[in-house]
Amino acid sequence: FIMGRSENSRNRVFDPVPERGGICTIAADPAKLEDPSLIIYNPVLTLGKTHIVTNGDQTDTIYDLMSQGKSFADALRTRTFEPDGPNYTPRISAVVYEDGSYQMSILKSADGNGDSMQRYFFDYPQPVAGEGHFISTYKHNGNPIPSFEGEPLRFACPRTIGDFAQGLWSSLNPDNKVSLFARVIDLDSGETGDMIFNKYDAVCSDLDDPEAVSYTHLRA
């Protein structure tokens, strides 16, 4: 999911990119778009049977380098946190593999020090059934906003994608939430089912593209 505090960061919706097995962010109202550099990107892409999800344009870095035989960690060692001091927004990323194992990462500054880079990687080769892990950009509000700390948080996964997505969407701050994407993967067949929640309607978009039949779109 993505959140927004400024008008520019709230001016977004998730739009499916079926030819790449993922989604992109687009401006809900292009006339109000101020700076696209850190808010327009591909949050989700699929490389073969590997699913990549991040909070920035490092999605493409991971996709490109993994397609060349590099690893998730190799790709992220070429990147750093976002250049938006004094917050220096962390880059958070994850990959889910064909067998259901997954890896996560956060790239962040050292307590807001823009001259010091910290990279953390978390590997889950044998996930526990019914359990997931959560990592976010920030720990809580502040000035500057402190980055997430520690290991990813564990949570219990609901049995259906609908329960999971609806529960998560309803729990997000109603003023700041922008969009949510959820995906369920059949580990036997590799087939996927996706849901997209967008708080705002796009002024001009193809969100109802009939070719994107595997996507369920909801407004809230």
Stretch-by-stretch model annotation:
Residues 1-34, 157-214:
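Extreme N-terminus nucleophile/cap motif
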Residues 1-2, 42-44, 90-97, 104-105, ...:
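Short beta-strand scaffold segments in enzyme catalytic cores
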Residues 1-3, 51-60, 95, 103-107, ...:
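Short hydrophobic-aromatic micro-motifs
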Residues 26-29, 33, 44-74, 79, ...:
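Alpha/propeptide regions of enzymes that mature by internal proteolysis
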Residues 41, 48-50, 89-92, 102, ...:
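Short, surface-exposed beta-edge/turn micro-motifs
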Residues 47, 110-165:
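C-terminal, well-structured catalytic/ligand-binding subdomain of enzymes
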Residues 58-116:
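Short histidine
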Residues 216-220:
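Conserved small/polar residues in nucleotide/adenosyl-binding loops
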